[in-house]
Amino acid sequence: MLDVNNFEYMNIGLASPDKIRSWSFGEVKKPETINYRTLKPEKDGLFCERIFGPTKDWECHCGKYKRVRYKGVVCDRCGVEVTRAKVRRERMGHIELAAPVSHIWYFKGIPSRMGLVLDMSPRALEEVIYFASYVVTDPANTPLEKKQLLSEKEYRAYLDKYGNKFQASMGAEAINKLLQDIDLVKEVDMLKEELKTSQGQRRTRAIKRLEVLEAFRNSGNKPSWMILDVLPVIPPELRPMVQLDGGRFATSDLNDLYRRVINRNNRLKRLLDLGAPSIIVQNEKRMLQEAVDALIDNGRRGRPVTGPGNRPLKSLSHMLKGKQGRFRQNLLGKRVDYSGRSVIVVGPHLKMYQCGLPKEMALELFKPFVMKELVEKGLAHNIKSAKRKIERVQPEVWDVLESVIKEHPVLLNRAPTLHRLGIQAFEPTLVEGRAIRLHPLVCTAYNADFDGDQMAVHVPLSAEAQAEARILMLAAQNILNPKDGKPVVTPSQDMVLGNYYLTLERAGAVGEGMVFKNTDEALLAYQNGYVHLHTRVAVAANSLKNVTFTEEQRSKLLITTVGKLVFNEILPESFPYMNEPTKSNIEEKTPDRFFLDKGADVKAVIAEQPINAPFKKGILGKIIAEIFKRFHITETSKMLDRMKNLGFRYSTKAGITVGVSDIVVLDDKQEILEEAQSKVDNVLKQFRRGLITEEERYERVISIWSSAKDVIQGKLMKSLDEVNPIYMMSDSGARGNASNFTQLAGMRGLMANPAGRIIELPIKSSFREGLTVLEYFISTHGARKGLADTALKTADSGYLTRRLVDVAQDVIIRETDCGTDRGILAKPLKEGTEIIERLEERLIGRFARKQIKHPETGAVLINENELIDEDKALEIVEAGIEEVWIRSAFTCNTPHGVCKRCYGRNLATGTDVEVGEAVGIIAAQSIGEPGTQLTMRTFHTGGVAGDDITQGLPRIQELFEARNPKGQATISEIDGTIAEINEVRDKQQEIVVQGAVETRSYTAPYNSRLKVAEGDQITRGQVLTEGSIDPKELLKVTDLTTVQEYLLHEVQKVYRMQGVEIGDKHVEVMVRQMLRKVRVIDAGDTDVLPGTLLDIHQFTEANKKVLLEGNRPATGRPVLLGITKASLETDSFLSAASFQETTRVLTDAAIKGKRDELLGLKENVIIGKLVPAGTGMMNYRKVKPVSNVQPTEDMVPAE
């Protein structure tokens, strides 16, 4: 057998008849499968053991030779070779066809490849192949033309007239003759001449033909191989036949299809031997052609062949296609051993890097390890008895299991895995019961909750896999979210509430103004009821371990609360003492106003001080981010565990809970509603008098009720007590918001109907009062729409992620520096006047393209190719610089990837990105994962027609697929001035742009809003009317940079409007993939073909070559492809075929004789190699793990 895992590349091509025969181990002559009595394969049939190998290991068909000692012997009685039965998975057979047939992929595809080679229409081809017309194959010296079609009648007439002077025939034989007559070199030269003169349709056709003919010429495939003389039969184990319980057989559809081919082939042979009339023979040949078509691609032409119950049979093509096909089901979706799944429950006692694994599950998963250990410890004599011990669950097994799982990480995964944090490593601890215990802080990353979610466990087996899991995937290492570099493990719900309650301050609480010598004394007083957690007290500053106090502060008393003393115990000693939720307190030091001299009147000072806000969810997030920045991963994960414990403990102690009595109903609600109602009546009066239109009336009613609800909401919030549990939950960010509260205690407000239009009848009741039947009915609309939307959105968003991953899967960091001298100009992203993304956000973690100097002092702030970190970015912004040249993935020169400098910092680790990081997949996941949070709706603004702006998910799809947007804007194609704006017929507006050389006029629909006025100076690509620009148009008019910036800006706009932050670099990686291709306009002296799509790198290489020889380079224009199109245009045919349109991709690749260099991740997964990213890259492959080595001095890197 060939070494399956070690090859450099993979080729695909057409198989010649000789090639097919060389694969084969024998000819299948009979349609029989197995003998119904003996259940053994029939000789020469579809399962024949002589051709395909024995059905049982080391045993021939007749039983003369049994056992392995006869290995390689061919039985003299039955002719079966004695070998392993698994050869039946790889040995092929063949069928010698009595008449040639055409391969349906090449004849039926779009465009028809056979048609292009022969310059015949697919209609004509079909008539010939299916025996409806004759085609002239050799006109000799008659007036007929080669490739001319003749009907039966015409053929007879010409035969009478010219006799045997000319030759015409039908079927695939005729096509085969024509294909063999083609002289590729001559045809290609003729077409190249034709291209120089022709225009329009003829030119397009010529380009298409040239492409196919060149492909044949360069690949070494012969056109006549598109016609099959011999048909390969795939190995029987790949089209199995199994016996069911009832004694019946279930078989693969392929066997039926093969059987039809063999039957028709044998009948045709018999008819030819008998010398049957030509009409019968022709009919049989046509049926054979149809049988082969059905086998290769059933249903491509005519009605599909059906099995029992009118179900179309699955042909060879269907075996590859779609989600259930070979590619996506078996090659990219393999199931793995050593895995299990169970329900998850919360494990609040766990450390960040731990998970609880049920005992029985762990025993099953680690069985082989336990067996080995049992034997090594002498508790079992051999593997068999060890296995028996485990199956009987004897007591000593548990001790061994404990020692085996120690420091052996497992992977936990929750479906759907939307980003890389959906699968993380943990150290297992054994737990009773049957549920997996999950650490509460990783729930955000998994998007898990404990209402019945299930998770899967996988065991990394090899030492390398364990090391990778521990170093790269351990939950304690994955604190930052790859999409924006912010911590993903912020506390939530109970934990937030506990810490909020702990840090509350209350004026006049019990024991206010007491002075303590240290924390312990304060806690003692709290436990004995002398002070409360919320009491403001004073503590000697020098008793606290905090290092950040200044000398002056140390000598004084610190004013704080007992709760804050407890809270600060969990922070590192060199972190400022947190006394108020402000940026300066987190980043610099505790403000001086909290310190007072010893001997001062503490109570009086405290009474004058304002109350400080407690620590809400956002502040906790900022504290975590700051700790991560200063102390790095290990310290952060320890601190997070402490914060979690504190939160749970104090939310339990606080006993915060919700009762009906906590929902306080507003007293003057009725008056507000009556006032609103009278305003609505007024509006109605105006409408009835014809003073306002229906549309205006509707708008006004809606706005009256909305403002009434706002008034109620405002009053409610004011009337709430600080310690009201509902208020605390919403204020702390634990659960709920002001709107939820308004619905509970105020009014539910306006609802939308199923079409998304707001119903003008508001729900005046609140949940506390109860809804009337009508109100209840109205609110069901909204609820149902919400659920339906969510279901649709999930599928849409998942499909978007799949396309994004597919287009960017081969983008890997391949080198340190590509040496480019280009970059992009980073400015703040604005929408109108509102800043969507600040300049410093765009700069952090990027490399500077040019040296940046302070505009006033001239001091160098940052050098060329230097990393801009948080502090440097702040310096740049504070210096008043508004735009900065930075390195970007847009301008990176690395083929098949990006370089470290152009990419910048890895957001997930906060450090430089490593060579080998799969940044393409990370980018795709970062954009796709928040997809479910985006809205589905198209917003209707004020009912102005033609003004529906697409937002949310549909807009993202529109941008990445480069579709013509809804509500398209008109853009100017030239620089110039707006000369005039006129109204023309049909209420349209005409905008005349006067340039230096030419004048252009644009018409815009009557109701579109203009963005320009007469006399304005405009540049090419500028918008004239409101709406979204079509990026393809923009590319025609302007340059690459403009389009890149536009796409980046638009994508960011959609996400930021929904409150989702995504790093620019992710969008850059995706947009770069969409702009990778160039359409060749003029080939110059290169050997590229005009009209073809080429990768930018291939294009520049080809040009470099001719320029060095002093010849004319090719010219091309960049093309913007949508992500689906871009993934199908990738260089790797394996990746493209496993994505969509499998047959088209493979047909094309086979004709071109494509070679897949296996550069991306997908191709390597498909063929079962390690992916060429991360530790799978060539330079890491040489690293071998060594077990149990004691570390020495020289192993430890210097700090």
From Swiss-Prot:
GO terms for biological process: DNA-templated transcription. Pfam families: RNA_pol_Rpb1_1, RNA_pol_Rpb1_2, RNA_pol_Rpb1_3, RNA_pol_Rpb1_4, RNA_pol_Rpb1_5. GO terms for cellular component: DNA-directed RNA polymerase complex. It catalyses: RNA(n) + a ribonucleoside 5'-triphosphate = RNA(n+1) + diphosphate. Zn(2+) 2 binds at C818, C892, C899, C902. GO terms for molecular function: DNA binding; DNA-directed RNA polymerase activity; magnesium ion binding; zinc ion binding. Its EC number is 2.7.7.6. Zn(2+) 1 binds at C60, C62, C75, C78. Mg(2+) binds at D449, D451, D453. The keyword Transcription applies. Its cofactor is Mg(2+); Zn(2+). Binds 1 Mg(2+) ion per subunit. The keyword Transcription applies. It comes from the Bacteria. Keywords: DNA-directed RNA polymerase, Magnesium, Metal-binding, Nucleotidyltransferase, Transcription, Transferase, Zinc. SMART domains: RPOLA_N (SM00663). The RNAP catalytic core consists of 2 alpha, 1 beta, 1 beta' and 1 omega subunit. When a sigma factor is associated with the core the holoenzyme is formed, which can initiate transcription. Belongs to the RNA polymerase beta' chain family. DNA-dependent RNA polymerase catalyzes the transcription of DNA into RNA using the four ribonucleoside triphosphates as substrates. This is DNA-directed RNA polymerase subunit beta'. It comes from Bacillus velezensis (strain DSM 23117 / BGSC 10A6 / LMG 26770 / FZB42) (Bacillus amyloliquefaciens subsp. plantarum).
